[in-house]
A protein has these predicted regions:
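Short helix-initiation/N-cap motifs at beta->coil->alpha
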Residues: 22-31, 122-126, 216-230
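Paired acidic/hydrophobic, glycine-rich loop segments that form the ligand-binding mouth/hinge
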Residues: 43-46, 234-238
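Hinge/lid segment of periplasmic solute-binding proteins
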Residues: 48-105, 145-148, 165, 259-266, ...
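Extracytoplasmic/periplasmic solute-binding protein
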Residues: 82-90, 95, 125-186
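Glycine-centered hinge/linker elements that transmit conformational signals in sensory
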Residues: 131-132, 181-218
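C-terminal capping/gating helix-and-loop segments adjacent to ligand/active sites or protein-protein/ligand interfaces
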Residues: 279, 322-328, 340-373
Length: 374
């Protein structure tokens, strides 16, 4: 409905008719195929990444010369075929290890603490040393500071509401580094160069946890969120989208926005001290190369209006609540999400973002088997 409202505003302002066709949940690809078979084809559609693009690359206009592309803050947020820009992300999200900086700062003041500042956690070895020490001193920390910590990490639940955090988002790290080494964006089969790294961060999650490993199969996403929100854990792998849940007063959580930040997921790779957060998209705009030149230009004009006009930016940033990769979303159109602010700070500090390569994973079965084998 928000896209339809925005399209109506554009039509009222410019006189150009914009029709928005929505698909029922889980039927976007099917709906797109149906619409593409009609005499009047959509001029704008979206794909979720390289796998989605593979089905539609012959329908994607090269956007490299567009004004829309010129407003991108990074080429990390495009889908390319050679030098041709076939898709541009319009929503970006970030994930990493959410942490309670208040508890960590208190820990740093303790005798024999592994670190004296949170900033010292910039690789897997240090993260593990800190988590191990916290796990071994839970009673001491609780007694000294009045917390009710149950573990260093929240439960890494393998219930369907939670397992995507590990078989998709955590699995992205070893895939990213293998792709980075080879200078590729996709492959028919990974070699598993960094699977041992995947295993060691997973082992840390389930060892220094709020629950025993045998309980993980039934632990849910809501339970992990609650554990972090109620200050029962210091570390919690999740993303920027969790901010609204953790700060929603109706949930009754003890943690506040001022308590929270986000650090990278370190897996023990050489040079990871320069790593930032995992930032990417599953929402890319594509302009139909089969449409008329007139319709293509009208579509590009609409998209440029969306990211530059006050009405468009207000809708995207505040009504839809999206974070975008465009340089036009500054000032009042910037997010007040502390996790996004942390991501921006890593970028400002020159840290490299870990791109989302999990969209190249071929199936849910592959994901399930990958966790079984580690």
């Amino acid at each position: 409905q928000q896209w339809q409202d925005l399209a109506a505003k554009y039509t009222a302002e410019t006189g150009t008719e914009v029709t928005v066709i929505t698909a029922a949940d889980g039927t976007y690809e099917q709906t797109l195929k149906s619409e593409m078979a009609k005499s009047e084809v959509p001029t704008l559609f979206q794909v979720n990444g390289p796998v989605g693009l593979a089905n539609w690359k012959d329908y994607c206009l090269d956007l490299s010369g567009s004004e829309l592309y010129s407003h991108l803050t990074s080429d990390d947020f495009v889908l390319k075929d050679g030098n041709a820009v076939q898709g541009i992300a319009y929503v970006i999200e970030t994930y990493g290890i959410i942490y309670n900086k208040t508890i960590l700062n208190d820990y740093c003041t303790m005798d024999n603490a592994v670190i004296s500042s949170v900033d010292e956690i910039n690789n897997f070895a240090t993260l593990k040393a800190v988590a191990d020490d916290i796990q071994s001193r839970l009673d001491e920390i609780n007694e000294k500071f009045g917390y009710d910590l149950q573990g260093a990490f929240t439960s890494a639940g393998m219930d369907g509401s939670s397992d995507w955090r590990f078989k998709t988002h955590l699995a992205n790290l070893p895939i990213y580094y293998e792709y980075k080494d080879k200078g590729i964006n996709s492959t028919d089969a990974i070699e598993g160069t960094y699977l041992d790294n995947y295993k060691q961060i997973w082992d840390l999650y389930i060892t220094d946890s709020t629950c025993e490993p045998g309980m993980l199969s039934s632990k849910t996403g809501d339970e992990a969120e609650s554990e972090f929100g109620m200050e029962e854990a210091v570390f919690y792998q999740n993303g920027t989208w969790e901010y609204s849940n953790l700060t929603n007063e109706e949930n009754g959580y003890l943690v506040t926005a001022d308590d929270m930040s986000m650090m990278p997921i370190y897996i023990g790779v050489e040079g990871e001290e320069n790593q930032g957060l995992c930032t990417g998209s599953e929402n890319y705009w594509c302009v139909n190369s089969k449409a008329s030149a007139e319709d293509q230009q009208a579509t590009l004009d609409f998209l440029n209006w969306v990211i530059t006009s006050d009405a468009g930016r207000e809708s995207i940033a505040h009504e839809m609540g999206f974070t975008t990769p465009f340089d036009t979303f500054t000032g009042e159109y910037e997010a007040d999400n502390v996790f996004i602010q942390a991501s921006n700070q890593y970028i400002a500090d020159g840290k490299y973002s870990v791109t989302w390569n999990f969209s190249t994973i071929p199936s849910e079965t592959w994901k399930d088997l990958s966790l079984i084998h580690i």
